[in-house]
Amino acid sequence: MTGNVEYDVRRMFRHACAFTDCAIFCQKAPNSIVVRTQWYTIPEIVNSAFACEVFIKSLLLHHGMTLEEIRKKNHGLKGLWKAFRETDATSAARVEYDVTQPFNSQNPDFCDNMLDIMSEAFKEWRYIYEGHGACINMNFLIIFRNRLRSFCCESYYQMTWSEYESRGHASCDSDTN
């Protein structure tokens, strides 16, 4: 990290976008492979969960939390999201509203319940072969990841994800890291 908050959050944003790209590749790749020897759902989950983590951590940094404070949060999405909600309740509520709409849930705790289930997805699914069980709602994970990406893009670049994507990050940033 450079200590330049704007630079660092944008760099974190691009890194999270790269993990999102990897997750999307894992989702789409099996359709183009004739003889498959791997199941790509697990890498899709791991990359999506890690992208969510980095998106949220970039938001925390953007809102004034120090790197030391962020590091103490570890990987848990529930705790990270709770910290963001405490920092910017209005934006968090907007993201939660957008994420829960496709599910048409009347449960006011729907988002929290989903985050409870997937909070440790990065750690749990990364080592799923060790034999412990894990559960996740893929639709929620994907919608949450994509909404975080859009929200971060709006926050850091004042443009929609579609606008950012069509311009390419090279024209939005002075660096390419």
Predicted regions and their residues:
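Long, charged low-complexity segments
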Residues: M1-F13, M65-N177
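Charged alpha-helical initiation segments
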Residues: M1-V46, L59-T66, G168-N177
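Structural signal for well-ordered, non-membrane alpha-helices
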Residues: T20, I24, C52, R149-Y156
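Residue-level detector of short, conserved catalytic/binding motifs and their immediate flanks
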Residues: I42, C52, K123
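Conserved beta-strand->loop/alpha-helix structural units within folded catalytic cores of enzymes
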Residues: S48-K57
